Amino acid sequence: MDKLLELYQQAVDKMLCYFTPILLLFTRLWVASIFFKSGYLKITTWDSTLYLFEEEYQVPLVPWELAAYMGTAAELILPIFMVLGLFTRPMAAALFMVNVTAVISYPVLWEGGFYDHKLWGLMILLNVVWGAGVLSTDHLLKKRFFK
């Protein structure tokens, strides 16, 4: 029985060696796509974005105009780092905060879009906890400079 459990554990470990990097890459690309598209929409319809931040969104602690600039910049810049897998943990943590802020600031999301934000939050947290994995610039830099 011990031999069977050991073989099972070895098989699972081997499978995870291949599956985990693909999962981490998938989550990075998926979340980056969602947030970049959101930032792109904000910047291409800037007047509407300013209106929404002034009238609809209830961003705490930050003036609405600053929140519009910061939110749009974060949604355009952070996904680039996620795609590259560069400085993944801090960039993912920042993107997680953008996601949390979106949920807090726009209560209308709680009815229909909250599920999506929870899913994105979990995908982002995978990268905060595990890092970007071997399919990333972080891994290449680590191999190059921290042998």
Language-model features and meaning:
Residues 1-44, 62-73, 77, 84-147:
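Extended, low-polarity transmembrane helix blocks
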Residues 45, 49:
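Extracytosolic helix-loop segments that constitute the early lumenal/periplasmic catalytic or substrate-binding loops
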Residues 50-62:
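Perimembrane loop-to-helix junctions flanking transmembrane segments
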